[in-house]
Design a protein with these regions (language model features):
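Short, hydrophobic transmembrane alpha-helix segments
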Residues: 45-59, 83, 112-113, 364
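Predominantly late transmembrane helices and immediately cytosolic-facing juxtamembrane segments
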Residues: 2-27, 31, 36, 42, ...
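Short acidic, Gly/Ser-rich segments with clustered Asp/Glu that frequently serve as metal-coordination loops
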Residues: 37-38, 49
């Protein structure tokens, strides 16, 4: 009986999932995929950390953005596909495992990208992941007649763009920033084109949960990275107040960013049409700002202990830029067009203040701590004002 059940699971039709399925949650396989992906994100963060303290920031940042996009885009494709078609059969699990192997190959190639601008290994890993995904879309074309054209559009689009990556890297053309940008735009265009025919049945609540989980994972990885740098620095000399302020400030920043993200509902941005694309694509700035902030805080420890070749002021502006990018996304999607009065402008005002703080403090520890206090004050003021408005509405209604 159990053998027959296993055989049925192996041969299960690759039918679409119900987008209104109750209590849809992330699967253990999806969580494993996320955790493996953190290895690649952590590797990229370590490379950026070392580049920052060696004063190679402007050379390393574009490279980091390129690497992070490749990682994030592979995660994006897997996540949205799984939301619509994860049937957890044997072949699906095996193809997901192939994608996991591809992500590990990508992680192995990250140091060469930073040190030699060599994308060979990372693109090989990318090809492994994409071939597995194309196979999944071909399965969809076979088992979901309603969206067969959509599935073929995805499969063909992915193959064509992947050929562009291969030609751009392994031919005489070479991978230039302009070519990279063109290929990125092509990658982003594939889902827009494919979904025009028939929208895949992704699950709104499941997608929101998947994005939230990755946000927590990237936050956690950033905290671990900065903590490891702090632990190493503190083991080599006596701790002073400046470094204590730096550690407290870094933790407060991460806590405030977590609070800001999870203090609001993301589900109303999951309506059909173009808005889910803006919401989903826009999260790139959420994830990369958190990841860069983690590397920056780790580098800030080296600045504080005088083991870096970058100034406290420059480090402060890098950290302010991370908070600004993160806050701008939150502001545009949740406050700029939904709030009225002065509360609408709390984020822009906070961002301006953050960029001025490095002008008034000479040590990175104080800079980080004051930035964290300012960011938390914005959160407190917004919460107090909101609660006050809610109390007034309740009093008026009674």
């Amino acid at each position: 009986m159990s053998a027959e059940k296993n055989q049925n699971k192996t041969r299960k039709l690759f039918a679409p999932r119900d987008p209104e399925e109750a209590q849809r949650a992330a699967t253990p396989l999806e969580l494993l995929f996320d955790l493996i992906f953190v290895v690649a994100i952590a590797t990229a963060g370590q490379q950026l950390h070392h580049a920052i303290i060696e004063a190679h920031l402007w050379h390393a940042l574009p490279t980091y953005v390129m690497v992070f996009f490749a990682l994030w885009w592979a995660w994006m494709n897997f996540t949205w596909f799984a939301s619509a078609y994860d049937n957890d059969d044997t072949l699906y699990r095996c193809l997901t495992f192939v994608q996991i192997v591809g992500s590990l190959v990508m992680a192995a190639g990250i140091p060469a990208v930073f040190q030699e601008h060599n994308f060979d290994v990372i693109i090989i890993g990318y090809v492994i992941m994409r071939l597995a995904l194309v196979t999944q879309w071909i399965r969809v074309a076979k088992h979901d007649p309603e969206r067969r054209v959509t599935a073929y559009r995805y499969a063909v689009g992915i193959v064509l763009v992947q050929l562009g990556w291969l030609i751009g890297n392994f031919s005489a053309i070479h991978m230039t920033p302009l070519l990279f940008l063109i290929l990125v735009l092509a990658e982003l265009a594939v889902p827009l084109y494919a979904e025009k025919y028939a929208v895949t049945p992704w699950h709104p609540h499941h997608i929101v949960e998947r994005y939230a989980l990755l946000t927590i994972i990237v936050l956690g990885e950033s905290i671990i990275g900065s903590f490891a740098a702090t632990q190493e620095a503190f083991s080599n000399h006596d701790v002073n107040f400046k470094e204590i302020f730096l550690v407290i400030g870094g933790l407060l920043m991460m806590f405030a960013m977590w609070w800001v993200y999870f203090d609001r509902s993301h589900h109303h941005h999951q309506r059909r049409g173009v808005q889910p694309f803006l919401w989903g694509y826009g999260h790139f700035f959420i994830f990369i700002s958190i990841a860069v902030l983690g590397a920056a805080l780790a580098a800030a420890v080296d600045v504080s202990t005088q083991h870096a070749h970058i100034s406290s002021q420059m480090m402060g502006w890098l950290i302010a830029a991370c908070l600004a990018i993160y806050s701008t996304y939150i502001w545009l999607f949740y406050e700029a067009f939904d709030l009225s009065g002065w509360r609408r402008w709390l984020y822009p005002i906070t961002i301006l203040i953050l960029f001025t703080i490095p002008l008034f403090f000479a040590d990175i520890g104080y800079i980080v701590f004051v930035m964290a206090v300012v960011y938390i004050l914005r959160l407190v003021i917004a919460k107090l004002y909101l609660n006050n408005c809610n109390d007034k509405r309740m009093a008026a209604s009674t």
